[in-house]
A protein has these predicted regions:
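Conserved, mostly hydrophobic/aromatic
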Residues: 21, 52, 119, 167, ...
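Short beta-strand/loop segments at the ligand-binding rim of alpha/beta enzyme cores
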Residues: 14-20, 92-103, 144-154, 202-213
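Catalytic cores of alpha/beta
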Residues: 30-42, 159-169, 211, 215-231
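Alpha/beta catalytic cores of nucleotide-metabolism and tRNA/nucleoside-modifying enzymes
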Residues: 199-205, 216-226, 230-269
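Glycine-rich phosphate-binding active-site loops on the catalytic face of alpha/beta enzymes
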Residues: 47-56, 124-128, 133-136, 175-185, ...
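Glycine-rich beta-to-alpha transition loops that act as phosphate-gripper elements at the mouths
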Residues: 24, 101-109, 133-134, 155-159, ...
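Active-site-adjacent beta->alpha loops and helix N-cap segments on the catalytic face
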Residues: 1-11, 30, 55-66, 74-89, ...
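Active-site/ligand-binding-proximal alpha/beta "capping" segment
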Residues: 174-181, 185-230
C-alpha cells in the first residue's frame, strides 16, 4: 500500500479529514522547500503534500502560484532538482505522502517510463497531471500502477456527467475536486451549487475526494470537511512564502507551518 492510501486509511480510522498544503517546489529556493517539508512533518501540520513542479505556463494556476513558479525558475529549479531534493528528504526520514503536480510536457520530455521510474525511486507517491486529458492518460496510468503510484485526476463544476463518470472510473489515490470554474486563487466564498456538486462527486467516487482551489481560511476548510475527505490549500501558502521570501529557510518553514496549523484547526477540533 502506498503512502497516499495508507494516509487516508489512517485518517478514516481516526475519524479525521485530510489537510493537504500545496508547496511550489523551489520557491524561493529548494533549501526553503526542504525546510518546509521537514517542518510540516515535525509539527504534524499536514497529512499529505501536493508539491508543484515549476513550469513556465501552468494552465490552471492563478497569479499567486504563477509568481511562485517564476521565482523558482529564476532560481534555476528543474524537475530533476525537485526529485533529487525529495530523494534526500526521504533518505533523511521524511514520510509525508507527496503528490507531484506536474505538467505533462515535463513528464514526456525524459520519457514517461523514465520520469515515473525516477519519481518512484525518490519516493513520490502520486502524480497530478492537469494538462493530460483522461482519454489520453492510459499509458501513464499503466506505468503509475506498476510503480504503485496514485494517478490523481481532477473534476470541475463544468465537467459533463459522462466525462466525470469516466474520470472517476480511472482515478486512484484521491479525486482532486476543483471547487470553482477557473484558476487557482484565494476567494471569499464558494460559488452557488458548491455543496450539491461536491456531494455528487463524493457519492460517485470510489476513492477519497479532496477539494482545492479558493480555500484560504479556516472556515473554508471547515465547510469542505463537512462534504469531502480533505482540503487542499495553495495560494494562501504561496502568499505566506512570498511575504517572507527574504528570510532564512527555517523562518519561512515556521511561517508556513503556523499557517497550516491555523487553517487546519477545524479538522482537529
Amino acid at each position: 500500500m502506498n503512502r497516499v492510501d495508507a494516509a487516508f486509511r489512517r485518517l478514516r480510522r481516526e475519524g479525521r479529514k485530510a489537510f493537504m498544503p500545496f508547496i511550489a517546489a523551489g520557491d524561493p529556493n529548494l533549501d526553503v522547500t526542504a525546510a518546509v517539508l521537514r517542518t510540516l512533518q515535525d509539527r504534524g501540520a499536514a497529512d499529505l503534500v501536493e508539491l508543484g513542479v515549476p513550469f513556465s505556463d501552468p494552465i490552471a494556476d492563478g497569479p499567486t502560484i504563477q509568481a511562485s513558479y517564476q521565482r523558482a525558475l529564476a532560481a534555476g529549479v528543474t524537475p530533476q532538482a525537485v526529485l533529487d531534493t525529495v530523494g534526500r528528504l526521504r533518505a533523511g526520514g521524511l514520510n509525508l505522502p507527496i503528490c507531484l503536480m506536474v505538467s505533462y510536457s515535463l513528464v514526456y520530455r525524459p520519457g514517461v517510463p523514465a520520469f515515473v521510474e525516477h519519481a518512484a525511486a525518490v519516493g513520490i507517491d502520486g502524480l497530478i497531471v492537469p494538462d493530460l486529458p483522461v482519454d489520453e492518460s492510459g499509458p501513464l496510468a499503466e506505468i503509475l500502477s506498476s510503480a504503485d503510484m496514485a494517478h490523481i485526476l481532477l473534476v470541475a463544476p463544468t465537467t459533463p456527467p459522462a466525462r466525470r463518470k469516466t474520470i472517476l472510473s480511472h482515478v486512484t489515490g484521491f479525486v482532486y475536486c476543483v471547487s470553482v470554474t477557473g484558476i487557482t486563487g484565494e476567494r471569499d466564498a464558494f460559488p452557488p451549487g458548491f455543496e450539491e456538486y461536491v456531494r455528487g462527486v463524493k457519492k460517485a467516487a470510489k476513492v477519497p475526494v479532496c477539494v482545492g482551489f479558493g480555500i484560504s481560511r479556516p472556515e473554508h476548510v471547515a465547510a469542505v470537511a463537512q462534504l469531502a475527505d480533505g482540503a487542499i490549500v495553495g495560494s494562501a501558502i504561496s502568499h505566506r512564502v512570498a511575504d517572507n521570501a527574504g528570510g532564512a529557510p527555517a523562518k519561512i518553514a515556521r511561517e508556513v507551518a503556523d499557517l497550516c496549523q491555523e487553517l487546519s484547526a477545524p479538522l482537529r477540533s
